[in-house]
Amino acid sequence: MTQVAKNDHRLMQVLLAPVVSEKATLVADKNEQVVFEVARDANKAEVKAAVELLFKVEVQSVQILNQKGKQKRFGRFMGRRNHVKKAYVSLKPGQEINFEAEAK
């Protein structure tokens, strides 16, 4: 496993937003996982370090998903949605991230 540079500025840029969807909430309830949208150049070690730094929790594992943007029609023009990189973060037993309490 590679050593992660403890550059706090870089780690603050890794996590972009939590993913709020039906699938993400099912995964969170069933498997104690949290889904984040992450930077396109982020790796598993950086995501793990960023979650542990920002939320003060212990991470068990990280799975990365590269989602291609869909082709969509805008009027008579064809376009494409942006590509997205997601991270499924598994927390150790007993750990929890509460986004409502973090916002206060």
Curated annotation (Swiss-Prot):
The keyword Transferase does not apply. GO terms for cellular component: ribonucleoprotein complex; ribosome. It comes from the Bacteria. GO terms for molecular function: rRNA binding; structural constituent of ribosome. Keywords: Ribonucleoprotein, Ribosomal protein, RNA-binding, rRNA-binding. Gene3D superfamilies: 3.30.70.330. GO terms for biological process: translation. The keyword Nuclease does not apply. Belongs to the universal ribosomal protein uL23 family. PANTHER family: 60S RIBOSOMAL PROTEIN L23A. One of the early assembly proteins it binds 23S rRNA. One of the proteins that surrounds the polypeptide exit tunnel on the outside of the ribosome. Forms the main docking site for trigger factor binding to the ribosome. This is Large ribosomal subunit protein uL23. It comes from Cupriavidus necator (strain ATCC 17699 / DSM 428 / KCTC 22496 / NCIMB 10442 / H16 / Stanier 337) (Ralstonia eutropha).
